[in-house]
Amino acid sequence: MLSVIICTYNRRKYIYNCLKSIAENDFDASKYEILVVNNNSTDDTEGECRRFGSDYPQINFSVCCETSQGLSYARNRGIEEAKGDILVYVDDDATVNREYLSTIAQFFDRYPDAMAAGGAIYPVYETEEPKWMSKYTRELITAYKDEGRRVIRMTGSRFPSGGNAAYRREIFDRVGRFDPALGRRGNLLISGEEKAVFYSMKRLDMPIYYLPSMILYHIIPQSKLTKQYFDNLTLSIGRSERLRTLSVSKAVFGKRLVAEGIKWIATIILGIGLTLRLSPEKAAKIFAFRRNVTRGLLGH
């Protein structure tokens, strides 16, 4: 059985369409459940969930409330409440394709070695994509992911986005739960909780795959395209990496600092290239990205 877990905080505008896209999948309703974990929403997210439950009575649908604020707390509550052996996390500001659930179910049946999987993520802008957006900042802002048209094992530093990921339940008994010190908390943009889980899995050589037909369409509002959001997000990425690596060891943190130096070299090369191609606004953004990540990594 699949358990589709949607952790939500103040997503009244998007949650109904998210749930609707799952319910309208070409998949037997008796083979999955949808579980919403409401993380102290103050808008009418709960009302939209009730509306969905009324409109789709055939769906095994439930809502629980996690009062400890934070995405990691909500995700961990989902593990506790879910009944399935495959746990699927879907972002609350997104929709999925009609083959989403069947793709996941068939994959885990065909790949008994697989312990987790993630899919493609395509942005859906509510306004135009800004001129400063490049392939280097698109993944950062929108969680864009496209690893090609084939099922592949994600090796090295590659891993799925936490908002479009499926896990065998048993992995959480082996690597532990999502770290509450990481992950979004209300409007705070700390992240990295799923990255910590995936790296723990890789240390145990637990296979993680990419599924091209597991598609999520991520809605990007204008509020995520502002300078304030960009600076807050990128600074939070650095802070998250500091927390994540120091929680493992000082040696791992030291390696991350060395990696940051290498990333600066790549950033300078990319920035020069973009400037020469007459895209100075794109170059400025990748420099701002690297600067903010470094500041967060150093504890600012």
Regions found by a protein language model. Name each.
Residues 232-240, 246-300:
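Non-catalytic, C-terminal membrane-associated alpha-helical segments of glycosyltransferases
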Residues 21, 38-47, 94:
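A conserved acidic beta->alpha catalytic loop
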Residues 87:
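Short aromatic/hydrophobic "clamp" motif used to bind/position activated sugar donors
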Residues 162-167, 171-176, 181-214:
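A short, conserved alpha-helix in the catalytic core of glycosyltransferases
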Residues 136-158:
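Short, flexible, basic/aromatic active-site loop/helix in glycosyltransferases
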Residues 11-25:
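Short, well-formed alpha-helical segments that are part of the catalytic scaffolds
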Residues 99-133:
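Conserved donor NDP-sugar-binding/catalytic core segment of glycosyltransferases
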Residues 66-82, 103:
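Glycine-rich, basic loop-to-helix element that forms the pyrophosphate-binding segment
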